[in-house]
A protein has these predicted regions:
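A structural signal for small-residue-enriched, beta-sheet-centric alpha/beta enzyme cores
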Residues: 1-231
Length: 231
């Protein structure tokens, strides 16, 4: 199990986030550290509330050793794979909760970038979209402004062929091979934008690597919280 706090100044590298994971499994510190580092990449380092990385943050994992089994000292131990899956599940759940609790958040946004040449490119695109003020305000206003998503993809600095670009909001395909889908129904997409959970899928179509980022919208409440705040 674990606990985490943080709602503002969050784009961990690992930022203003405190997270503590506890397990009764008797696992050596070296293995715990490696498992934590491996799973942070796609959990806490895949979230962004406001794109700002704080001067401090921490995710720690502790073993109480209370479980009655022989100590795990090797990655080849058959118990490690099951523990690895469970650890990622806990970390991802906590990371998503930090985003959902973000300052002024009204929507939870999942941005999945698929079929890139490499994971670095996929991550750049995902965070370029996740951190775009124009994208985030459009989402807050429940506006299916896919043009802003295209803009954010373009400014990511990744070489790509826009003639192969595909963009979906939820199950609705908006852009197909670089052009608006001839069957696109804006009213249907506008209705989808009223949901509290929004999925944006971006298919780059020039490779096989992917990255998923999690973020929130940028609301008037967020601005009020941060303009009224005094240090």
């Amino acid at each position: 199990f674990g606990v985490a706090k943080g709602s503002g100044m969050i784009q961990p590298n690992m930022a203003t986030t405190l997270c503590y994971i506890f397990t009764d499994a008797d696992i050596s510190n070296d293995i715990l550290k490696k498992l934590l580092k491996k799973n942070i990449a796609t959990t806490f380092n895949a979230i962004s509330c406001d794109s700002d990385t704080s001067t401090n943050d921490m995710v720690s994992i502790f073993s109480t050793g209370k479980a009655k089994h022989s100590k795990i000292n090797s990655f080849h131990d058959e118990k490690i794979q099951e523990f690895d899956v469970a650890l990622k599940k806990v970390l991802l759940n906590l990371a998503k909760r930090v985003v959902a609790d973000g300052e002024g958040a009204s929507k939870f946004i999942t941005i999945k970038v698929q079929n890139c040449r490499n994971e670095i490119d996929a991550k750049k695109i995902a965070f370029s979209v996740a951190n775009s003020p124009l994208v985030k305000t459009a989402l807050a206003g429940e506006d299916p402004n896919w043009g802003r998503v295209v803009m954010a993809i373009g400014k990511a600095g990744v070489q790509l062929n826009f003639d192969k670009l595909c963009i979906d909001f939820g199950e609705i395909n908006i852009v197909q091979n670089g052009k608006i889908n001839v069957h696109y129904n804006e009213n249907e997409t506008t209705d989808y934008m009223k949901n509290d959970y929004i999925d944006i899928k971006i298919n780059i179509s020039n490779g096989s690597k992917s990255f998923t980022a999690y973020t929130m919208d940028l609301t008037k409440k967020y601005i009020e919280i941060n303009t009224d705040y005094r240090s």
